[in-house]
Amino acid sequence: MSGHNILTQLESIDVLDLPYVERDLNFAQLVSLSFLLYGDEHSTATYILQKLLVLARATASDWPHSDILSQYAKSKPQTWRKYLVEALCIIGARQVLRKLGLCWQELRMHYLPHVGSIRVHIHPLLKSLYTICEELTLAQRGRMVLDIKEKNSVGDPLRFYDAEYLEIFLLDWLTRRLIRLGDFNANGSDVQLLIEYFKFNDLHAQATLLVDTVNAYATSSCSPATPNVLLPMDGNGIANESSSPTAAASRPRAKNALQLSRENAGIALIINQQEFYRDANDDYKVYLPPIELPLRNGTDMDKQRLTNVFSMLGYKVEAHDNLDHLSMLHHIRQACKRSLLHESLVVCILSHGFEDAVYGANSVALRISDIENVLCSYENLYEKPKLVVIQACQQEDKENNALPYKINASTKSPCQYLNMLRAMSTVPGFPALRHTQTGSWFIQSLCDAIVEHSNSDHIADILTIVINNVANKRGNKNETMVPWTGGALRQHVYFPRTSATDKVVPDSPGL
């Protein structure tokens, strides 16, 4: 459905439909809907908060007398329909949308309700906060409410205690200005209170969502009193002046560590495999899997994010799409040869794969350990950090019986493997998860961690943060994933420092 057709169907929704819409919602849905619609209207948020508190104490028979949605339509006579429908999509009220004559699948493709940081009409921070409410367990919500109320008691306390409806507490904090949404693009926003709480309690995914939302939409601060500066966190997850970008640059790093420079950081080679075909050369038939490899939608988001982040660090990024196995090997060898005057080398491969192997675009796989042998065989990379990042499934290939193409790369001493480091999207034997619109969990989390922690933490610690963040994620069907790292670093290695003026591009530009 095109955007024009959606707008046409929205006009068919009448204000007289709203009481029936409200009756079809349960209390939890009504709370979420009220939060999304009224959260950025400070003048009416207090009134709606009181209405919700009354409904929470009332019996179900009193609900037909609720007019929250009708009041909203009166407050926005020209635009209420598009806000309401997007909010209904976000909370997943499919039955209500069907009764309004709308198609859920078409609305889902238009509004992307499953992508927390992307919105069409609803305030971006409200959508992100709702997503967080859905992600937290009841126990996590309860601890959050108690902790924030204890440390930020302002005025009369909210006489409501059911943390299941976390949006009610968020509305209360908005009306007390403990958090601020800023304008429609989050300029002048201040959600640092929540970010600090999430970081301190190891809820890194939730903190990252808020940071990315502000970075994606805000362009400047509305006023000096309500800046939208999001401070990095110190080692304990506490944000303060000493952890600002400027201060982080002067914070002492570990002694006897290898610190890479922006001027000579090196090459970041990105091999992005999205489209696959079966090589027709008879010599390669033995290496082909029995079935065609599918399109890897979403991988361009990973490529773009890696390009942005490593460019920010000073690396010379070289990104290539859809390379066959020999072209992959050629570009890897060329990067090694041109690393004589560089301090490190990064190779990122985004593809399909199986255990210890990644596919070329021609469906011929290379063994990952052989790729590492290539990197370690070049004298001009001896003892230099060599980071291989792999986003690919690593399941055992019991059914396909595909063979990796053999690479000739010889090493003469175990010392050649010093400072070799591999970062895998998943532990051996398991698939790697990738969102078809926003990219993979692993690559996006890796880039987030580098942006946030590279000034203060060495590479091995950054990868540990990534493992924790990804392990805490859950898919729509409760899917899980655990990244894996391994290597032979002989000392701590730090990425080049970045300054506050370095531009960090958000996760999902252009969607």
From Swiss-Prot:
Record-annotated active site: H352, C393
Q: Which PROSITE patterns match?
A: CASPASE_P10, CASPASE_P20
Q: Which residues form the propeptide?
A: 1-242, 406-415
Q: Supply one GO CC term from the record.
A: cytoplasm
Q: EC number(s)?
A: 3.4.22.61
Question: One GO molecular-function annotation for this sequence?
Answer: cysteine-type endopeptidase activator activity involved in apoptotic process
Q: Which reaction does it catalyse?
A: Strict requirement for Asp at position P1 and has a preferred cleavage sequence of (Leu/Asp/Val)-Glu-Thr-Asp-|-(Gly/Ser/Ala)
Keyword list, A-Z: Apoptosis, Cytoplasm, Hydrolase, Immunity, Innate immunity, Protease, Thiol protease, Zymogen
Q: Where in the cell is it found?
A: Cytoplasm
Which Gene Ontology terms describe the biological processes this protein takes part in? apoptotic process; defense response to Gram-negative bacterium; innate immune response; proteolysis
Among InterPro entries, the record links this protein to: Caspase-like_dom_sf, Caspase-related_regulators, Dredd_2nd, Dredd_N, Pept_C14_caspase, Pept_C14_p10, Pept_C14_p20, Pept_C14A
Describe its assembly: Heterotetramer that consists of two anti-parallel arranged heterodimers, each one formed by a 15 kDa (caspase-8 subunit p15) and a 10 kDa (caspase-8 subunit p10) subunit. Interacts with the N-terminus of Fadd.
Q: Please explain the role this protein plays, according to its UniProt record.
A: Effector of the programmed cell death (PCD) activators rpr, grim and W. May play an apoptotic role in the germline as well as soma. Role in immune response, required to resist Gram-negative bacterial infections by regulating DptA. Fadd interacts with Dredd, Fadd promotes cleavage of Dredd and is necessary and sufficient for enhancing Dredd-induced apoptosis.
Regarding protein family, the annotation reads:
Belongs to the peptidase C14A family.
Q: What is this protein called?
A: Caspase-8
Gene name of this polypeptide: Dredd
